[in-house]
């Protein structure tokens, strides 16, 4: 099966912080994604001028597609970039990983996610969407999905409901399975009713972390969260951090996978994205949910041990060896 993803095309600028004080000074909500404007970005740049930083490809769904490509899968990515250095950087990184890109170029600058990593590997985003903000229904054609079997969608896109509705309709018309990552608890909180419509009408597979699942369902019980989501779609997955992950088919039993112990968690930025890649890789190879969770966990375990989303060749060799042994 061939997999394509659609989401915000962003370049990450990563900052490693010794504590959380700077986050309050630049008015970013800890452990959440906040949309910023150009003036706000200018303030962030001014206040972080003496903080170590580096640039890497970002965007939740593009991370997942890169991970799938590294596992040898045929994958694609749809997004919108600017005709600028950041856009060329983004495109080149995806292509180098083996991802087929369908990138619409706009007049706006390529989007940037200022990503702050605090002790314990937690991350906070100040995101200037730039060109990604202008991805619209007119950019999406059914032809983009031809030849693919599954579409993985970024939950952040619900902030443009006309766009995500168009994406889902055209992908369904093309016969694709639809997978959705809820992406952010504050986005879910603001769009709870619309997410309910989207999932019940279009989505086959849902990924959520515990915070997102709580925002969507109103429940603090992970198993109740899982049942609620699974009632609306075919497969529900709730990620529980160091408590592992759970999944179920609609009306079926609950499967659980424990997290692997990691002595030094560096950065959780791409952990959920890599988990989704491992899960979808196994699922589209016909494996049971229990094994899908295990393979997702293998990838997430490696992801939290590096800063950013790029794993070394040695890490990919460990991943492939672990998958082969399961």
Regions found by a protein language model. Name each.
Residues 69, 95, 172-173, 230:
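Anion (oxyanion) recognition and catalysis
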Residues 75, 101, 178-179, 236:
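Hydrophobic beta-strand scaffold residues
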Residues 95-110:
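A glycine-rich helix N-cap at a beta->alpha junction
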Residues 104, 115-158:
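Conserved phosphate-binding/catalytic loop of the ribokinase/pfkB sugar-kinase fold
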Residues 150-227, 243-245:
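Conserved beta-alpha-beta core of the PfkB/ribokinase-like small-molecule kinase fold
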């Amino acid at each position: 099966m061939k997999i394509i993803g659609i989401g915000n095309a962003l370049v990450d600028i990563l900052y490693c912080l010794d504590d959380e004080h700077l986050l309050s000074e630049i008015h970013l909500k800890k452990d959440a994604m906040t949309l910023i404007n150009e003036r706000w970005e200018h303030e962030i740049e001014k206040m972080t001028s003496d903080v170590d930083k580096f640039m890497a490809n970002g965007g939740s769904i593009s991370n997942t597609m890169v991970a799938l490509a590294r596992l040898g899968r045929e994958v694609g990515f749809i997004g919108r970039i600017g005709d600028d250095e950041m856009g060329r950087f983004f495109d080149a990184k995806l292509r180098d990983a083996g991802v087929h890109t369908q990138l619409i170029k706009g007049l706006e600058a390529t989007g940037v996610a200022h990503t702050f990593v605090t002790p314990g590997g937690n991350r906070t985003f100040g995101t200037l969407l730039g060109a990604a903000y202008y991805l619209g229904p007119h950019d999406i054609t059914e032809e983009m999905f031809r030849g693919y079997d599954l579409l993985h969608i970024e939950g952040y896109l619900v902030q443009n409901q006309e766009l995500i509705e168009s994406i889902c309709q055209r992908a369904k018309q093309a016969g694709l399975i639809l997978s959705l990552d809820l992406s952010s608890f504050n986005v879910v909180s603001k769009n709870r009713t619309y997410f309910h419509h989207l999932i019940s009408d279009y989505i086959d597979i849902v990924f959520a972390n515990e915070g997102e699942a709580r925002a969507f369902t109103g429940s603090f019980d992970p198993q109740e969260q899982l049942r609620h989501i699974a009632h609306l779609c075919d497969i529900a997955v709730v990620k529980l951090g160091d408590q592992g992950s759970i999944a179920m088919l609609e009306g079926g039993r609950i499967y659980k996978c424990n997290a692997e112990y990691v002595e030094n968690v560096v950065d959780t930025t791409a952990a959920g994205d890599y988990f989704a890649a491992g899960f979808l890789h196994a699922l589209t190879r016909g494996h049971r949910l229990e094994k899908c969770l295990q393979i997702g966990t293998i990838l997430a375990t490696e992801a939290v041990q590096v800063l950013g989303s790029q794993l070394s060749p040695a890490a990919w060799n460990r991943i492939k060896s672990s998958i082969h042994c399961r």
